A protein has these predicted regions:
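Low-complexity, flexible helical/coil segments
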Residues: 12, 61-64, 84
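Amphipathic alpha-helical coiled-coil segments
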Residues: 54-73
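Short E/K-rich amphipathic alpha-helical oligomerization segments
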Residues: 23-52
Length: 84
């Protein structure tokens, strides 16, 4: 059961990273709209680069979360089968 608890704890940490990055991306999208309306081309290009990197990181974290979910399920099933 300790392993299961550890996995769940790690998954919660990943979820926190995921939510943080999503909120940062949303914040950048708001700034993107402002810069676009102000016709700030150079700053807008730099922001879009940063957003592209954030999206890559977000996909990596989402994949990690999916893998952790599968591992948590396997661990739970192992614990459950051992108690039957």
């Amino acid at each position: 059961m300790k392993h299961f608890d550890y996995l769940v704890n790690e998954q919660l940490k990943t979820m926190e990273r995921l939510l943080y990055l999503q909120s940062e991306l949303e914040r950048c999208q708001d700034i993107e709209q402002e810069l676009d309306s102000l016709d700030e081309g150079a700053e807008l290009a730099a922001l879009r680069e940063e957003m592209a990197l954030m999206k890559i990181n977000l996909r990596k974290i989402q994949k990690t979360f999916e893998n952790q979910t599968e591992e948590v399920i396997r661990s739970y099933q192992e614990v459950h089968l051992n108690t039957i």
